[in-house]
From Swiss-Prot:
The keyword Cell membrane does not apply. It comes from the Eukaryota. Keywords: Transposable element. This is Putative 115 kDa protein in type-1 retrotransposable element R1DM. Residues 479-741 form the Reverse transcriptase domain. InterPro entries: DNA/RNA_pol_sf, Endo/exonu/phosph_ase_sf, Endo/exonuclease/phosphatase, RT_dom. GO terms for biological process: DNA biosynthetic process. Residues 955-971 are annotated as: Gag-like cysteine motif. One of its GO terms (molecular function) is catalytic activity.
Length: 1021
């Protein structure tokens, strides 16, 4: 019999209580916690143990914590509302509905009752457990009632909840205990209830107890369930993985050669599927020997930050709670009053110790990874380490809660069923023999650490196998080509579902995207097949910019802009075509027919590749598998290639009638005309061509997402293009290839949207970027240069000319200000121009201009009059020399802005007169207190008084004006800390010269020490 246990607790929105609850859950045998009023601020690692999953309601009033690695958790989005959170959990104990709700005392109870009705209705015959802070008392859940209870509000709420429980035919698990579930020194009651439906009542027997808790007004409830019938548990082997940190590659090679040599002489003539299976087994065995299997260990139940002081503080709180209970039993009001005062003091001290210890642990953790910008801290802050759960799905208005059924729905959504089987293809000629260099080229191009397929073998291992036994692998691939057979094991991907966006409805199957993780050896064979077809492939349409080496989004947009600008027509109408599930719906018969038309010599192998395919979703509780009969496998080598050769047919048909741009499945048609009627007629004609092609290959268009917009000219009434019996939507702006374009080919809307898009990224990382104990300055610069700036500057060669406008520059400055405030330890009132210099970040409009000119020089396009290097003789310069010259122009333009006395940031200019200081030195950094002096914005009465944060501008020394210069150069209160000569500060008449301080590391450290000591002393004063 498999036990099932969980905790129920109300944290009172306390950080210390939530931290300690996480520790209790990790240390105990419980798997889940039904929590009311949790603390949800801060970082994941700052509050809860690593690996613990959290599901909350919309208000953050209730949460479910999951500390069971093997449990499948399916959030029920339709039942995760303002009133509670619901989860379907599946594991060795079976399938159970868990629900947590906080029934707010000053809110009516009826909405919560309706919510619980919905939970019970959805659970039906599945066991359901509801953990409530009901703020209600009743004999039904054995509340210990006084004789005055009937007149109280929580008693009337209890009567209402009791009536509902009788009508709903549910039961309370509460048992009689001496300890109250609620005890806040002033009052005691039993207002917490654990409710189960009929299915849960029959499913198990329960032990329900209350344990005293020092950190909340509520005590902790622990429930242990023992199922009445034992279940046979099927063990699902996880995808194997190995440790590469201490890999012994020489031993790996020796073992591979030895194991292959032990195979029978006639093994090369055995069935291909058997050879593939044997190769996998050998590779697994050798990896176990030379690399070592990466074991899935349960998280440590020990809290490394728990100290002896915490234990002592907890003992003191428990001692005082016992004294309080003794005093209440004796009705000794005087003793109770004294103990309550002591208990409050001890509880506050204990909570403070817990918060400080956990924060110190988080700081140590961040400090240990401070120099790794893309490591564990980054992934935690960005949410990259959180598991992607398959939630409950809605199909035809009905909610599906079984994990297996949901997995099948997703697989069917990812891989639609073909209406007809692919025809048998017969190879008309014998494929040429496989050359070793073909395999070597394909293996070398593998990404080493890409996620593996079901066999767990990644690119690193494949390359090692190729180095060890090249003849054996080449022979295996050669036989596949010769026999025209693609091994079945290599055609079965492991499918991972990803939510398309945070704003998508998690209950809709269409909100997910399926990624196929294929076996790496199969990818090598696919690459060989694709390369062979490319050898006989004629040149495709020149306006396809996706899947083309050396082409990019900027190329596609430049073609669009030049076509619109060069058009002799009065109007140009852009038709942005959207294919519904483009890659997923391709008919294999169309792909085979196209391959045959191209003269492919491996038709038998391609036919085998497109037959007998399967797709698998695997978890700890089961495996779901469906046959695949159509579509280009996303994540495969051949998928983009197949789409490319099919879409080339469409582009060739459209090319005589219009200008166009295609990037993978993103298609833009440019319809030219001198009147609305011409635009409408030509637009309908072109859409008819697209529709015909879609029917041939099995794809259809999305009539709601295919939109039109005027890119040139203006009409009083927008054109109406008919397609599939309806008008295509006309829009004022449209996002194409990651860039938002507005009517008339304008990009100000795109620039205006950048700040909002970056808010989430900055918010997730700001806490470890801004903090003095967070990332190192070099890591911060790496994240800025490698993540934030590229996100903002994506497609800069397309829209950089718009950045010359004053409105656009203001928008870009606002966006950059948001980013730099998230990266630098400064006051939020510091000017943007000063932030740019302190962060070594050039203004974004100048950075965009730099990227645009680099793009033009790379492609050989002519420079325009406002471009840097325009008119200069750069023909004799190398590429590196050109980049250096461009950087000089960037710095000069930036320096000119910085030297403008009308700009703010003049205090910072006195310390850093040249913009290259931080720009050239990625390790340049400073603390918050140092920034007070460098910017003049900080803890100075003159500064604070100007913002109504201080009653006076005077210093404590008596000087009438306390500002940064007074603190640094004159205040007698800090004379013993001041060393102006050591800092290199000079005085010329009435002026102080500070510009040499930050040029020297020793002086910079002295300034930092001075700032720390001064502002600590000032705070004490």
């Amino acid at each position: 019999t498999l036990m099932f246990s969980f905790i129920q607790a109300n944290c009172g929105r306390g950080r210390a209580a939530t931290i300690e609850l996480g520790v209790r859950l990790r240390r105990s045998e419980s798997m889940f916690a039904l929590v009311q009023e949790p603390y949800l601020g801060g970082d994941e690692m700052d509050v809860l143990p690593e690996g613990m999953r959290v599901f909350t309601d919309r208000r953050g009033k209730a949460a479910i914590l999951v500390d069971h690695q093997e449990a499948i958790c399916m959030p029920v989005e339709t039942l995760t509302t303002d009133y509670g959170v619901c989860l379907v959990v599946k594991g060795s104990f079976g399938s159970i509905f868990l629900c947590a709700a906080y029934c707010q005392f000053d809110a009516p109870l009826e909405p919560y009752l309706r919510y619980m009705d919905a939970v019970l209705l959805q659970a039906s015959r599945t066991p359901a457990i509801l953990g409530l802070d009901a703020n209600a008392v009743s004999p039904m859940w054995l509340s210990k009632l006084s004789r005055h209870a009937e007149g109280q509000a929580n008693y009337r709420r209890g009567e209402l909840l009791s009536e509902w429980m009788l009508e709903a035919r549910v039961a309370a698990l509460n048992q009689s205990t001496e300890v109250y579930t609620f005890d806040n020194h002033r009052a005691t009651s039993d207002i917490d209830v654990t409710i189960v439906n009929e299915a849960a009542s029959m499913w198990a027997t329960y032990e329900w107890r209350v344990d005293e808790w020092e950190l909340s007004d509520h005590n902790i409830i622990t429930v242990v369930a023992e199922p009445t019938t034992a279940r046979s548990v099927e063990s699902i082997a996880p995808v194997p993985s190995w440790n590469f940190s201490n890999a012994r590659w020489r031993l790996f090679k020796e073992e591979m050669v030895s194991r292959i040599a032990e195979l029978p002489e006639n093994f090369s003539e055995s069935p291909l599927d058997q050879q593939v299976s044997t190769l996998r087994s050998i590779v697994h065995s050798v990896c176990d020997t030379a690399l070592g299997r990466k074991l899935t260990r349960s998280p440590s139940r020990r809290a490394r930050w728990w100290t002896a002081d915490l234990c002592a503080a907890r003992r003191e709180v428990r001692r005082l709670r016992r004294l309080l209970q003794d005093g209440r039993r004796r009705d000794d009001d005087a003793a109770v009053e004294l103990v309550v005062v002591e208990l409050r003091r001890a509880s506050a001290y204990y909570k403070k110790l817990i918060g400080r210890a956990k924060m110190d642990d988080w700081k140590r953790f961040v400090g240990d990874h401070a120099d790794d910008p893309w490591g564990r801290v980054y992934k935690i802050c960005r949410g990259r380490r959180k598991c992607t759960e398959i939630g409950c799905l809605r199909v035809n208005g009905e909610l599906i809660t079984d994990w297996g059924d949901c997995a099948r729905v997703l697989l069917r959504n990812f891989f639609p069923v073909a209406e007809s089987e692919a025809p048998t293809a017969i190879a008309e000629e014998v494929p040429p023999a496989l050359e070793v260099f073909e395999v070597d080229t394909c293996v070398a191009r593998l990404k080493s650490r890409r996620s593996p397929g079901l066999d767990g073998i990644n690119g690193t291992i494949c390359k090692a196998v190729w180095r060890a036994i090249p003849e054996h692998l080449a022979s295996l691939f050669s036989r596949c080509i010769r026999l025209g057979y693609f091994p079945a094991e290599w055609k079965c991907p492991r499918v991972v579902s990803l939510l398309k966006g945070p704003d998508k409805d998690k209950c809709e199957p269409s909100s997910y995207r399926g990624i196929c993780l294929l076996p790496v050896f199969g990818k090598v064979l696919e690459a060989i097949m694709v390369n062979r077809v490319r050898e006989v492939l004629p040149e495709g349409c020149r306006w396809q910019f996706g899947f083309r080496q050396g082409r990019c989004v900027e190329d596609a947009w430049r073609h669009v802009k030049s076509s619109v600008g060069a058009s002799a027509a009065q109007y140009v109408l852009g038709t942005f075509v959207d294919f519904k599930g483009a890659f997923d719906n391709v008919e294999w018969s169309a792909a085979l027919s196209r391959l045959a038309d191209l003269g492919c010599r491996e038709m038998g192998l391609w036919q085998s590749f497109f037959s007998g395919r399967r797709a698998v979703i695997r978890s700890s509780s089961g495996t779901v598998e469906v046959p695949v009969t159509r579509g280009c496998p996303q994540g495969s080598i051949s998928g983009p290639f197949i789409w490319d050769i099919l879409m080339d047919v469409l582009l060739q048909r459209l090319q005589p009638y219009c200008q166009l741009s295609a990037y993978a499945d993103d298609l833009l048609l440019l319809v030219e005309g001198n009147s609305r009627a011409v635009l409408e007629e030509k637009g309908a004609q072109l859409m008819s061509i697209v529709e015909t092609w879609g029917a041939e290959v099995g794809d259809c268009l999305s009539t709601s997402k295919t939109v039109i917009m005027l890119l040139k000219g203006a009409l009083r009434r927008a054109p109406t293009v008919r397609f599939a019996g309806r008008n295509l939507p006309y829009v004022r702006s449209c996002r194409y290839l990651g860039i938002t374009v507005s009517e008339g080919m304008k990009f100000l809307t795109h620039i205006a949207s950048l700040r909002q898009r970056m808010t989430g990224v900055v918010g997730a990382l700001a806490r470890v970027l801004r903090a003095d104990w967070g990332f190192s300055p070099r890591a911060r610069r790496t994240i800025y240069d490698g993540l934030m700036a590229p996100c903002v500057l994506f497609g800069a060669p397309v829209w950089y000319d718009t950045a010359e406008q004053v409105a656009a520059q203001r928008r870009l400055a606002s966006c950059q200000r948001l980013i730099l405030l998230g990266c630098l330890s400064v006051c939020r009132t510091v000017s943007t121009v000063a932030l740019q210099v302190l962060g070594g970040a050039p203004p974004l409009d100048l950075a965009a201009k730099l990227l645009a000119i680099k793009y033009k020089l790379k492609r050989g396009f002519p420079l325009e009059e406002n471009d840097w290097l325009y008119g200069e003789d750069i023909a004799c310069l190398s590429w590196e020399q050109r980049k250096t010259r461009l950087e000089e122009c960037l710095i000069q333009s930036w320096q000119n802005r910085w030297d403008d006395d009308s700009e703010p940031g003049r205090v910072t200019h006195r310390f850093i007169p040249y913009v290259t200081l931080a720009y050239r030195d990625p390790s340049f950094g400073f603390s918050m207190r140092t920034s007070f002096l460098l910017t003049g914005h900080g803890s100075f009465n003159a500064f604070l008084h100007g913002r109504a944060l201080s009653d006076t501008t005077a210093c404590a020394c008596g000087d009438p004006y306390e500002d940064w210069m007074h603190i640094l150069c004159a205040c007698p209160l800090y004379a013993d800390l001041r060393d102006l000569d050591g800092l290199g500060v000079q005085r010329l008449g009435e002026n102080w010269i500070f510009e040499g301080i930050l040029d020297d590391q020793e002086k910079t450290q002295r300034l930092a020490m001075f700032a720390e000591e001064v502002f600590l002393r000032r705070r004490a004063l």
